[in-house]
Amino acid sequence: MHYAIGQSFLLVTPTQAARIYSGIATGSKVPKLQLIKKIYDHEKNFQAPETFQIDQSLLKIVKNGLEICVDSGTGQAAKLENIKVAGKTGSAEVPGTTGRTHGWFAAYAPADKPEIVIIAIAEKAGHGGTIAAPIAKRILEEYFKISNKPLASNNKPL
């Protein structure tokens, strides 16, 4: 049961989660980790993103679940007014503490034609839906330029 809910010895970095969500968002393309726009091999051939095989009916179920999470589930704090967001909250237990969790929120938007994948993590700060999802929402608002508020105010971090 621990693996099913992402606990125990299951370790995933934010970068790995972002790659997984990119694959879900696009339906098959998993970007390589890179800090540059395109990668070419030594013979100047463009290196296309990796792909993975997934049954399209399963992919549809996963995407639907991610949309429901934001529309009416634990990810509602990341909901945008005119742009559909797909995402999932998570809370990772902190070893050696009682009740302390790292809050996670992984998302992509727009859900029907993804442009951006976000992984928001708030260490030892609480649950994903109450802590990390609002952070992701502010980033999405800034990305899509749908907020008049500055990303951070009063010199306080998000």
Regions flagged by a language model, labelled:
Residues 1-48, 57, 66-148:
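Active-site beta-strand/loop architecture of penicillin-binding DD-peptidases
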Residues 150-158:
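Intrinsic disorder/low-complexity segments
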